[in-house]
Structures are given as C-alpha cells and as structure tokens.
C-alpha cells in the first residue's frame, strides 16, 4: 500500500513540476489580465465618444454640422500620440504580432502596444472607421510575450502565450470564445497541436468568465432578425453572393494596401 502511495505521490509531483502545467497556469493568468485590459480599452472608447460628442454618439448628438469636425480632431490627437509614442503604431496590429511570432523570437515592445491602444481608442472614439481587432490583439500578444519572458519560458512557450493572449482578446472584444481560439491558432500560431490548443482553451475560458462577469453575456450582434430558407433555389444565389463578396473583399484589401503604400511614399 505504501508503494502505491509513493507512486501516486511521484505522479502528482511529476504533474506539478511539468512544463505543461506551468504553461497552462500562465495561460490562465494571461486570460484574466487580457480580459480586464480589453474591457478597459472598450470602456475607454465609450468614454472618448461620450466626451467628444457631448454625451451623445456618432449619429445621435447635439453638435449638428459641427460633428463633422470631430473625426479630424481625433485624427490629429492620434497622430500626435503616435509621433511621440511609437511610429510603429501606424501599422496594423495583427501583422506585427505575426511577424514577431515568425521571425522576432516572439518579442514585442510594450511602448508600441500602449501607443497603439491609446491612439486606436482616440481614433475609434472620434468616429474613424477602424476595427478593434488590431489594437486588442497587439495589446494581448504583448502581455503574453512579456509574461513569457519574465517567467523565463522558451521562445516556443512564449509563442503559445502570445496565442493565448490573442484568443482571450478576441473572446472579450466579441464574446466569441470559439472564434478567439480559431483566430489565434490559424493566424497567429499557424498550427493545430494539442500542446498549443489546451493553453488557448484555458485562457479563453478564463477570459470568458471574467468578461461576462463584468459586461454580461451579450452577443456582438444580438438584434438580428430570424431568417428561414423559403426555397432550395436560394442556395445557388448564396454561392453567387459568396463569390461576389469574396472578390469584393480581395479588391478592397488590394486597394487598402495600395493607398497605404502611396501614403508612405508620399
């Protein structure tokens, strides 16, 4: 009996000393703090909207035609923040993270992330047509990278923490846990392995619990009307619609990069 107890104790010690357990604990910590930071970012956007539009929003405010000037003011402030913060914040957040994971040993700059977050919140709050994905992903990935380096993790393990942070950020920003995991695995880690999948799920579960405790279980798109298929003839039309939208998306992306390139050269 004592031999069995000794074997059980050894197994427990082996589990407690395992790198996988350590990684999952750090992934849980990442999910906790990233959820809080992402919620603060979203609240900051709402605060800026409230201040700039005098208690209203983009469309419903008392500024009249003066509201047209608000995005310009916000853009000017964001430009100043980027100039004196980090000029790298001009770019897109997700590609910066992908580059760090692929060729920069999973290292990201804290100053860049802070500048990106503040500038993005100012831009979005003033009315710019910008998304939340890039800023929150960069912020979350930077947190994961910094935590991994402080915990003396390997480059590979730090890379997984970056993915865990990314998954937690998407989960919190859009209330989409599954979407967060898939986004991180496909775009950031570019792999489907158990070693990376489990920490991502752990981080996402923690982020979901924290986010819903603060903001409630609200769907990103909660007011969509119910829709039912009336005829089987609709299916070919959906295929055509998908093709058209896909081509339009490719064209939009190419146009976006072309304008970005012209802006940099100018």
What are these regions, as identified by a protein language model?
Residues 1-266:
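Alpha-helical transmembrane segments and immediately membrane-proximal extracytoplasmic
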